[in-house]
Amino acid sequence: MISSPLILHFPSSMQMTDDQFFQFCQENRDLRIERNQFGEISIMSPAGSETGNREGNIFGQLWVWSEKDGTGITFSPSTGFTLSTGAERSPDAAWIKLERWNQLTPKQQKKFAPICPDFVIKLRSDSDNL
């Protein structure tokens, strides 16, 4: 397992398009992959059992609340979002208001949706620095 993220740097001539990055992530589903606004790619190993359990509990609680509330939808840690900076990030749990989600096209909803969730949870791992 990778204890801290592996950062890949690419020259501007080798930057991936959004579609290429999405395909790269699909081909490497066993890894947690994010991209920052500068095109640098962070590769993290899958979560350990303890972290996976905490993620599952947090996501479950958010999902139960969302189902009762009925005004939005939840997303698991395997979901990527394209932020306004161009970065693609995957929080440990996310929630988006239905009215905002429904403004996206089906094509946008299918890939890394170009939207910043209304609520996110990101667990701090042992390798994260503050």
Regions of interest found by a model, annotated:
Residues 1-130:
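Gly/Pro/Ser/Thr-rich low-complexity, intrinsically disordered segments predominantly at protein N-termini
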